Regions:
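Domain-level signal for soluble alpha/beta catalytic cores
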Residues: 1-278
Length: 278
């Protein structure tokens, strides 16, 4: 994919490449696969002159993710990412335009047979609320809201870009009708900070928690962003995430099938220990 290219268009133009990537994660032990639709709202696709293929791109993504399981049990999560701007009154994008774009994407994902919609890497509760309403209107069987927090310069405190705390985010998502409270990506969010954020979610709501941290902190090498945390290093934080209340654990930027394979091993080991103690 060339820099600035439209990866979501690969669902139609290079489906076997997308399938190979997702199959690698399924083979590594993933129970859930997120569709290749993070930037597949019409607003985002229009920037690549792909808007007219919005529905086809989203439907194809669901089919590819389902195929990646190869007949094994698994959950397909239809991904809705940010639309890449700010809604009025903070920005110049009309709320009605975002409602229409998210509504179209949610309807395409639901009609294609997703098991849940995940609305991820959100920093604005207003935008998240529009996406949740779109998922509800489309009849999504399960809705996961997932916020992206940034670690502040001093200490371990985190906020979204718009200043939202984990407690505020958890309360909003629960009230808005999410079935799962998620956190993913962000700046300076490693496994330890992710576990702390999950505990803060838990202090507000008893809903299930999903955590997808990055593979450590990014560094710039030869004009490329590199995440150096190895599968073993990242997996060492899985028990703390489980103890904090996370029930769905994955990886975001920098994570690979090798990371997920180690996650799977740790989760299975913890489950075995829990059964042995029961």
């Amino acid at each position: 994919l060339p820099p600035g290219g439209c990866g979501e268009a690969w669902n139609l133009d290079a489906p076997e490449k997308v399938l190979a990537i997702q199959r690698a994660y399924a083979d590594a032990g993933s129970d859930c696969l997120i569709t290749n639709t993070f930037g597949a709202s019409r607003i985002m696709l229009d920037r690549h002159d792909e808007g007219e293929r919005t529905q086809a791109i989203n439907r194809a993504a669901v089919e590819i993710a389902r195929r990646a399981f190869g007949g094994r049990p698994g959950y397909v999560l239809g991904d809705i990412g940010p639309f890449g701007g700010l809604m009025e009154p903070y920005g110049d994008i009309p709320v009605a335009l975002v409602e229409k774009a998210f509504g179209e994407q949610a309807e395409a994902l639901v009609s294609a047979g997703i098991d849940a919609i995940i609305i991820e890497t959100q920093t604005s509760l207003e935008e998240l609320g529009v996406a949740i309403a779109a998922a509800q209107a489309a009849g999504a069987p399960c809705i996961i809201g997932s916020m992206a927090f940034d670690r502040l310069r001093e200490g371990d405190e985190v906020r979204t870009m718009m200043g939202t705390s984990p407690e505020q985010a958890a309360a909003f998502m629960a009230e808005a009708g999410c079935h799962v409270l998620g956190l993913n990506c962000g700046s300076g969010i490693d496994m330890r900070i992710a576990a702390d954020t999950a505990r803060r979610y838990r202090s507000v709501s008893g809903l299930p928690i999903m955590a997808q941290p990055n593979a450590g902190l990014p560094v710039l090498e030869n004009l490329k962003v590199i995440y150096r945390e190895t599968p073993d290093e990242m997996a060492a934080g899985v028990p703390a995430l489980l103890d904090a209340g996370a029930r769905i654990i994955g990886g975001c930027c920098g994570s690979t099938p090798a990371h997920i394979r180690r996650f799977r091993e740790i989760v299975d080991h913890v489950r075995h220990q829990d059964r042995a103690r029961a």
